[in-house]
Amino acid sequence: MKSFSIFFCKLDNEMGNSLFELIFLLSLFNFKWYNLSTFSGVKFITGCLHVVCHSKSLESTVFRVVIPILHRIKSLSTHCLFFLPLVRTIDSSINSHFKSTVFSDMYDSKRLLYV
């Protein structure tokens, strides 16, 4: 089972509209939404959209839907918007916080892909 997460910061109204569209489209799949604004050490992150893909074809469909919307959200703001694949390596204090509260997998910042 494949999974990935999308992190973003400081959403304004236009970005929020695009994000709502993204969440609506992803509601066809299995996703979870987390508000990370209170997580210590990651105050710059205000949200995380976690998507789980149950098949290879579903994964490619999600990517075709997600990436264009991510680019549109990015074009509406100078704030960092990035896509972070789930991997099984230990990274930073963010990982330990996620491991204990949100995810069982870990994140590797070296593999971070900007969009």
Curated annotation (Swiss-Prot):
Lineage top rank: taxon: Eukaryota
Other comments on record: Partially overlaps YPL034W.
Protein name in the entry: Putative uncharacterized protein YPL035C
Organism: Saccharomyces cerevisiae (strain ATCC 204508 / S288c) (Baker's yeast)
